[in-house]
């Protein structure tokens, strides 16, 4: 338990190495990737109901990090336009198989699953691990709406131990999201 407490302190005090990057808006990304503008995808809605669900989930999340009721820091979750970008990317590409590493509460997972649900096709396989005593399988993906889980398969373990088996036993992966 002491080593876990030390690890939490290390996590809290961890300094990130910042790197240069140029932020790109969704509209610019679509143009760079597909040669189209956002107006070409005007039929794509913004998943407002999903955003409301996720906002409500985080408002209702109780406890302090780290605890069984709040096993991940809130800033583990994607922010800004990342979720809507994943949603729109999946709506445009209509993938059959997506693999992601790292789920935590399941914000990016929810946006992907919303698109798959609306596409009425595709499957998401997610990999996440339980590496702290206060983390539980039940909290992994706990923000994901129940009605979106039918196209989701969660594999518990590290990417190093689980990913190779997924690659050997699945069809080609259309989108791979490494978020762990």
What spans do the regions from the language model cover?
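Intrinsically disordered, low-structural-confidence terminal and linker regions
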Residues: 1-8
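Active-site segment flanking the S-adenosylmethionine/decSAM binding pocket
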Residues: 11-36, 40, 44, 151-180
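A general marker of short, structured functional hotspots
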Residues: 12-17, 30, 37, 53-54, ...
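Charged/polar, solvent-exposed surface patches and flexible loops
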Residues: 28, 32, 52, 56-59, ...
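Class I SAM-dependent transferase core
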Residues: 39-82, 88-93
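S-adenosylmethionine/decaboxylated-SAM
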Residues: 72-180
């Amino acid at each position: 338990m002491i080593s876990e407490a030390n690890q939490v302190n290390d996590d809290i005090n961890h300094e990130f190495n910042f790197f240069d990057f140029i932020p790109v808006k969704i509209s610019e990304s679509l143009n760079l990737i597909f040669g189209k503008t956002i107006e070409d995808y005007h039929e794509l809605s913004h998943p407002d109901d999903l955003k409301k669900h996720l906002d409500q989930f985080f408002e209702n999340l109780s406890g302090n990090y780290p605890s069984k009721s709040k096993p991940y820091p809130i800033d583990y979750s994607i922010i800004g336009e990342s979720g809507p970008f994943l949603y729109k990317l999946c709506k445009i590409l209509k993938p059959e198989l997506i693999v992601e590493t790292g789920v935590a509460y399941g914000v990016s997972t929810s946006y992907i699953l919303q698109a798959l649900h609306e596409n009425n096709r595709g499957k998401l396989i997610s990999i996440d691990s339980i590496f702290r005593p206060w983390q539980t399988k039940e909290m992994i993906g706990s923000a994901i709406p129940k009605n979106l889980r039918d196209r989701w398969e969660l594999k518990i373990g590290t990417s190093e131990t689980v990913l190779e088996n997924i690659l050997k036993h699945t069809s080609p992966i259309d989108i791979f999201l490494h978020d762990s």
